[in-house]
Amino acid sequence: MPKWLLARPGPLAHCDDMRLTVVELDPAMTATARRWFALQDDPRLTVRHEDARAFLNRQKEQYDLVFVDVFNSHYAVPFQMGTREAAAALRRAVAPGGVLLMNVISAVEGEDGRLFQSIYNALRSAFAHVRVYCVGGTARPRDVGNLMLAAFAEEPDGAAEAAWEKSASPALLALLRTRYRGRLDFATLPLTDDFAPVERYALMLLRQ
């Protein structure tokens, strides 16, 4: 992701005043990215090797975009990143007018959607507006797939969005068309730091 954002013709290639901070727990992953995936040094890029939640808990700076892509296994989000308290910490990290993107592998509805539903409800408790995009091509709400949650610090301006979409690239427009338009009212409780059975929810998915 950092390489794509910063390298030509990436979206930030010509934005010299942009700054990108990556929080990665394992230094070996960064070394692998440099050795095998052509991640280059860039004065706009800062890499922090620490737990993402620990970083958030002490972070004072705010960001226009926060992207969360963390997994313990094929499906399980580390519990400390999917709770109501984590959502509040993420909200504090998002600047006014900014957005959080979070990658989750799950169904939307049914037993296989419990992980997504709990994280969705946690984000709804902290952000003004949350949308869901079925970016993995999920055909039906009960199918397991790649979901992208977009949580907005403020209610989106519909007129501004419509104007912005007129100049969006075809690839981005295709992504926006994957927005889930079904029911997003779930009884599943948000996870908390004291009760976060993410492994149990993930085991439901592993039986697929």
Regions found by a protein language model. Name each.
Residues 131-208:
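Soluble small-group transferase modules, centered on the S-adenosyl donor enzyme superfamily
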